Amino acid sequence: GAALQQLADAGLDDFYRGDVAREIAADLERIGAPVTRTDLERYHARLVAPLMLKLPGLSVANLPPPTQGLASLLILGIFERLGEARLDSFEHHHGLIEATKRAFAIRDRYITDPAELDHPPADFLSDAALMREAAAIDRKRAAKLPLRNGDGDTIWMGAIDGNGLAVSYIQSIYWEYGSGCVLPATGIHWQNRGVSFSLDRNAANPLLPGRKPFHTLTPALAR
């Protein structure tokens, strides 16, 4: 409660550069975590242009890397080009599942820290690229999963009011107990998003100083 009250009184920037940041850094040092107060002070939110996908009758926006917004747009774009409009048919479900597999394969290979991207994300959303992915789908046979099938328990909520003000909210600490690290001074429970890093320096998301981890956020907006 005290940490939340301090943030309410001093402003949210106190989390990174104020008294709350000081308490966080001290607790992290005590438990041997490598995150320092300097790391907290260097953090800045980035205002970026969204990725856009045009579909019949609407446009869909989502965030670029390091989130998986690209993957959600790929699923929609590939599936739309399959032309399977009959809801709840075998073709509909099969097409959606296979489009997801194709999108996840691209996600796992290319999405990384935006400063380290090899390909502009928007290139994957071109009509030619989406048609190529759709054409690679077998309409009758399931492809092998491109990734290990794990558990999932993240929740997402969205709300929009009569004035068009929208909120996209996701609650996730990645694993059941996140990092398992609760800081005693503030009561803050730290999530475990860093698990998406790899100790292989040649991997798409290597654990290196200053790198941003891959994140599963997908705050979509359709218009």
Predicted feature descriptions by range:
Residues V35, L165-R223:
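Active-site rim segments in enzyme catalytic domains, especially the processed small/beta chain
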